[in-house]
From Swiss-Prot:
Gene symbol of the encoding locus: rpsH
Recorded family membership: Belongs to the universal ribosomal protein uS8 family.
UniProt-recorded name of the protein: Small ribosomal subunit protein uS8
Keywords, comma-separated and alphabetical: Ribonucleoprotein, Ribosomal protein, RNA-binding, rRNA-binding
Lineage: Bacteria, Bacillati, Bacillota, Bacilli, Lactobacillales
Organism: Streptococcus thermophilus (strain ATCC BAA-250 / LMG 18311)
NCBIfam families: PRK00136.1
């Protein structure tokens, strides 16, 4: 089966595992998925990220994070720029997610950045997803 949007698939797998309260999620690796997973780790949405190398493309193991009473840290993830409709943002128009409570993941010339990092570096780019 040919996958037309591997990023949407990755976000959907995280959303589904989070809803089912799974501890660990494994997905096929790619550079952009590694970047998104690292941003989620850096921003405190997931506990840890491991990249398992094999002879093929590799696997990303994501350890999901929950609060003390089992409440979800990730409320939702939303794919913004899709293969059929790309969404770009100038550096002046970088979106804020829930007035700063969430993050926007943006693909820039500096690599994958959050909305705050893109504003600090004064760069725009393709808005990949919102996470809150």
């Amino acid at each position: 089966m040919v996958m037309t949007d591997p990023i949407a698939d990755f976000l959907t797998r995280i959303r589904n595992a989070n809803q089912a309260k799974h501890e660990v999620l494994e997905v096929p690796a790619s550079n952009i998925k590694k970047g998104i997973a690292e941003i989620l780790k850096r921003e405190g949405f997931v506990k840890n990220v491991e990249v398992i190398e094999d002879d093929k493309q590799g696997i990303i193991r994501v350890f999901l994070k929950y609060g003390q009473n089992g409440e979800r840290v990730i409320t939702n993830l939303k794919r913004i720029s899709k293969p059929g409709l790309r969404v770009y943002s100038k550096r002046e128009d970088i979106p804020k997610v829930l007035n700063g409570l969430g993050i926007a993941i943006i693909s820039t010339s500096e690599g994958l950045l959050t909305d705050k990092e893109a504003r600090q570096k004064n760069v725009g780019g393709e808005v990949i997803a919102y996470v809150w």
